[in-house]
Amino acid sequence: DLNILIAQSEEGNPDAKFYLGSLYYIGRELKQDYSKALELFKEASERGNIAATFNLGVIYAKGRGVKIDEKKAFEYYKKAAFGGLPQAQYNYAIWLREGRVEDPKPIEAMEWFKVSSNKNFDRSLIELAKGYEDGTAGRRDYREAVKLYRRARANEDNRDNSPYLNSTFYLGKLYLRGLGVAKDEKKGLRFIKEAANGNVNDAIIE
């Protein structure tokens, strides 16, 4: 109930502040208001709600109701990553690898992909698998890559989303080449076709 949520938020409940902020952010049940969302997320974050901290990172990264501020976004992603949120750990790792705010730190980024993968976060599983394919995860290990792609693939309820389709594509390539798994061209092509049908660009090019 919205009234209960508002009352709990006014009493200082960080989770209520986070959920109320989310409603303002997406404009569900309440008129979309990025300023109110920002205020509530800040209050929730200060009271220890890690998801609110992550959302602050998204707001500053995308410029939702504020000027884009990558330095602030990076700090919020970092705080939420250290707070244990897998999505934040993934975003923080991407920004570390790309050198969005600081100099690129690919080794540290890979460690964060590993941490997030331990919580079965699909996009991190894919990045870690790619790291085992190209050796940036510390060693080249195609069998480990296959395992990780399979985990990312199995992790998805909705087969239309990008982590499922991307892991299907990369797994298909390994089946085609017989790397880390018994060579199976039929299966490999089937997987790549499935990814292409889902508009994975690399699969369409392949």
Task: Enumerate the language-model features and the residues they cover.
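Short helix-capping/linker turns of helical repeat alpha-solenoids
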Residues: 10-13, 26-28, 33, 46-49, ...
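Canonical positions in the second alpha-helix
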Residues: 8, 43-44, 79-80, 115-116, ...
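N-terminal segments that cap or nucleate solenoid repeat domains
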Residues: 1-26
